[in-house]
Amino acid sequence: MAELKGNKYGTHRVIEPKGVLTQAAWKIDNDMSKVYSNEIVCDVTSLNIDSASFTQISEACGGDEKKIGEMILGIVAERGKQQNPVTGSGGMFKGVVAHIGEDLKNKPGFDLKEGDKIVSLVSLSMTPLKIDKILAIHKDIDRVDIVGKAILFESALYAKMPDDMSE
């Protein structure tokens, strides 16, 4: 993986419009083959979609799980992130750390290692996301189980999941 240095807030991934932060951007770069030295790549296992966003998507799709999945895939393909264009909201993800950029590995106080289970504490509306496959949609809890990847920027907040915590 290429190890370029990116902006700690992720502005290097903004495609449109230039000059804004990732949350305000319409489209961000979710190319997972291009990883920066101050980014964390995670294998994503589930998305917890913001309740207002999930409700809007579900209603627009008549509650049909296949259509809900297609709409989510479409949003991410178009925008590079899960940010509902109607509500503006995102959610958070759960996953496993797959790669840590070189600049972060030696950063004082950095406590992650590859293989750690984490939850993101920053919105999906600002997180580069690539979905390879939707495995299940849990309408009762606004959760979508996926196979995919996400990038956390140097400034991102996250929480490690304790080993004894149930999924």
Per-region residue spans from a language model:
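A short, polar/charged loop/turn motif at coil->beta-strand junctions and beta-hairpin connectors
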Residues: 20-22, 36-38, 91, 152-155
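NAD(P)H dinucleotide-binding glycine-rich loop of Rossmann-like/cofactor-binding domains
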Residues: 91, 117-167
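Intrinsically disordered, low-complexity boundary segments flanking structured domains
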Residues: 1-2, 11-13, 84, 142-148
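OB/S1-fold single-stranded nucleic-acid-binding modules
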Residues: 2-24
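Cytochrome P450 core scaffold surrounding the K-helix E-X-X-R motif
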Residues: 52-57, 129
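Short N-terminal binding/cap micro-motifs at the start of the first secondary-structure element
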Residues: 19-26, 50-54
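Glycine-rich beta-strand-centered segment in the early N-terminal region that forms part
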Residues: 33-48, 59-124
